[in-house]
Amino acid sequence: MSQSQNGAELRLVTPGSAIGPVSGRRVGTGALIQGDEIIATRVGHVRERHGTVSVDPVASCYMPRSGDLVIGTVIEARSNLWFLDINGPFQALLPMSLAPWKVEFGGTRDHADINDSLLMRVQEVDEVQNVVATMKGIGLRRLAEGAVLDVDVQHIDTLRAEGAALLKRLRDLSDCRLVLADNGRLWADGDASGIDWLRALLRAVAAAGRSDRFEAILDAHAANAPSQGDA
């Protein structure tokens, strides 16, 4: 079942489908072991890489979880809190008590205005999907520089696999500082040429759809990268 890196058509499975025998292989995201079989837990394409079997989703929607690192966009500022788009079906709220600034009542827009991007963590998600965010933590801040780019949620595991090898290549080739958030947003800070290259690459990956094509598309774009990094 080694079909992941040679461009072959991957097998499409649905939840509950038997992917194949375990046979000493490990299980990654989108699958589980049941008896001696590997079973799919989501709709997607089967991928095997270095002895690990995963199911890459055909499409994913970000669903917030406590502890997630997210980049939110301010869409409303009230007297004592902000509402933010976090690229999912539910907005997040940031109370001024969980902001990193000393905020006077009614002065929220003096610190984070409409369309500002904030690096936050999800503090709590309740049973009706109310999402509370916090900026109390190391590195959490308003992103006053750089650009926020979209990354399909289904590609995040691919970027973080094997010690974030692909993400490190993106950093080196673009010559940008990067922060990859769990909600499908990537902050990039560097020269305009590096940010533009990243934007074009991510659009090409989004058009291809499949996570297994990410590395091949990156290889194709590498020659035009602003920096050749360690390649």
Go through the PLM ranges and name each one.
Residues 1-231:
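Single-stranded RNA-binding regions, centering on S1/OB-family and related RNA-binding modules
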